[in-house]
Every structure is written in structure tokens, then in C-alpha cells.
Swiss-Prot record:
Gene3D superfamilies: Pancreatic trypsin inhibitor Kunitz domain. Residues 32-200 are annotated as: 2 X 84 AA approximate repeats. Sequence repeats lie at residues 32-115, 117-200. Residues 208-258 form the BPTI/Kunitz inhibitor domain. It is found in: Secreted. Expressed only in the trophectoderm, which forms the outer epithelial layer of the trophoblast. It comes from the Eukaryota. This is Trophoblast Kunitz domain protein 1. The record marks N218, A219 as: Reactive bond homolog.
Length: 265
């Protein structure tokens, strides 16, 4: 759960999703969120976030019902704000959507005050973890301006519905304690996630799926490669020989070639 929260925080810290700890939500056909950072534009997949949340639920977490409602609200805002693929930002939100986002943030703040943290069971012992740690990083990412596809919003909605059905007040969520119908729905959600992940990979050019190769020479060149694990174009040092097609001179070329838009051309 700690890894999940760290991941989501990196994500926008939203997507938010954004550095070495994968938040595990997608690429390509749902390919990620485009966010502006001082160091330049980056890609982060909505799947990275969803995956992290799903993994946390699978492990078994205590989460409060109001937190599930906030996830649902976030998914609704995303769904309203986009048709196909549209940049979500304070500037580009429809007015009614823009008004709803501050409301969602206010609800989050209230929940943050009310919730002193959720108890989760780990091998190392009992510890406190607040569901709002996860929710706030997602909200912050949306507020910053993210690109996310409708199918990704649907997965968030499905996750929130599962949480809502599985808990009343505070209940431990786990494979053992799920009601049968909830457990079945959870498995369906995981299958949808896996399918979307595979579709996403298939839609990318083959060179984007090649591993990073630094080479064995003595030069020092800054290059970029598409990381299939994180869904990001990431910087690496190329030594000037060997290598493969997943080797771009600049971030923009990497994103254009291996982004979801490129895969759909």
C-alpha cells in the first residue's frame, strides 16, 4: 500500500503518475496522461494508477465508503470532460466540469480531516494508511491537466463500484472477504485491465517494445527510450554503438513515435 501511495504521488505529483515507482495505469489506447513539468512534457498512463489501486485492493485494504464515492466522482468528471481523447485542464474543462472539480477537492479536504488513516495488515505489522493519500494524488493530477481516455475512466468507475459494494462503513477488502458477486466483478475488472494493457502494447510500433540498449562504447549521449513497464518515454545514456530502434534523440520524437496517437495513425 505504501508503494501504491508513493507511486500515485509521483504521478503528480497524475498521473500523476511520476517517476520510478510505477503507479500502474496505461499506455497507448488508453495511453496515459500528458503533463507539463519543468523538466518537459512526460507521458503517464492511466493504467499505472488503476493497476496500483487494484493491486492494493487485491492485497487487502481497509477503505471507507466516502473514499469510494470520491473515486466515482473523479471518474464522472473525467467522463464528462472528455469525448474520445481531450486534454483535461483548468483551461479546457467545460464550465460545469470546472465547477465540479473544486467541489471534489473540497470533499477530499473534508475527508482528509475526518480520516486519520485506515488500518492495513502487513507482514511487518499493523500500520495506518489513509485512502486520501491515493485520492489526492489522482485529484492533483487531474487539476494539473492530464490526458486520459474514456475507457480508463470506466475502469476507475468500476473500481469505485466494487469498493462501494464490498464495504459498509469500514470493512477489510480481500479475496477472502469479498462477497461472491463482488469477487467475480473484481476478477472481471482485472481481466479488463489486462486486456486493455495488451491492446495498448499491440497498438504501438514494434520498436517501442524493444528493450533499452546503452551499448558498450565510450561516448556519452543523452537519448530517450519508451519504457513499456511505466508507459513513459525516459532518458538514458547511450554510449554510441549497438543499440536498437527504441533510441530517440529527443523526448518529442519518442512520444510521437510511441504514444497512443502514433499507434492509431
Amino acid at each position: 500500500m505504501r508503494q501504491l501511495c508513493l507511486s500515485t504521488a509521483l504521478l503528480f505529483l497524475l498521473v500523476i503518475l511520476v517517476d520510478s515507482t510505477p503507479l500502474n495505469i496505461y499506455h497507448i489506447q488508453d495511453e496515459g496522461l500528458e503533463t507539463s513539468h519543468r523538466r518537459g512534457p512526460e507521458k503517464r498512463s492511466v493504467i499505472d494508477v488503476v493497476s496500483g489501486i487494484i493491486n492494493g485492493v487485491a492485497t487487502g485494504t481497509k477503505i471507507i465508503e466516502k473514499g469510494a464515492g470520491i473515486l466515482t466522482g473523479l471518474a464522472e468528471i473525467i467522463t464528462k470532460a472528455i469525448k474520445g481523447q481531450v486534454m483535461i485542464s483548468r483551461i479546457q474543462f467545460d464550465n460545469h466540469t470546472l465547477e465540479e472539480l473544486p467541489t471534489l477537492q473540497l470533499e477530499y479536504s473534508t475527508l482528509s480531516e475526518e480520516n486519520n488513516g485506515l488500518k492495513t495488515s502487513h507482514r511487518r505489522g499493523l500500520e495506518k494508511r489513509s485512502v486520501t493519500d491515493v485520492v489526492t494524488s489522482i485529484i492533483n493530477g487531474v487539476a494539473t491537466g492530464t490526458k486520459i481516455i474514456e475507457k480508463g475512466a470506466g475502469i476507475l468507475t468500476g473500481l469505485a463500484e466494487i469498493i462501494t459494494k464490498a464495504i459498509k462503513g469500514q470493512v477489510m477488502i480481500s479475496g477472502i472477504q469479498f462477497d461472491n458477486h463482488t469477487l467475480e466483478e473484481y476478477q472481471t475488472l482485472k481481466i479488463e485491465y489486462s486486456t486493455l494493457s495488451e491492446e495498448n502494447k499491440a497498438s504501438k510500433p514494434a520498436l517501442c517494445l524493444e528493450p533499452k540498449v546503452t551499448g558498450d562504447c565510450n561516448a556519452t549521449m543523452t537519448r530517450y527510450f519508451y519504457n513499456t513497464q511505466t508507459g513513459l518515454c525516459e532518458q538514458f545514456v547511450y554510449t554510441g554503438c549497438e543499440g536498437n530502434g527504441n533510441n530517440f534523440e529527443n523526448l518529442e520524437d519518442c512520444m510521437k513515435t510511441c504514444s497512443q496517437e502514433a499507434g492509431s495513425l
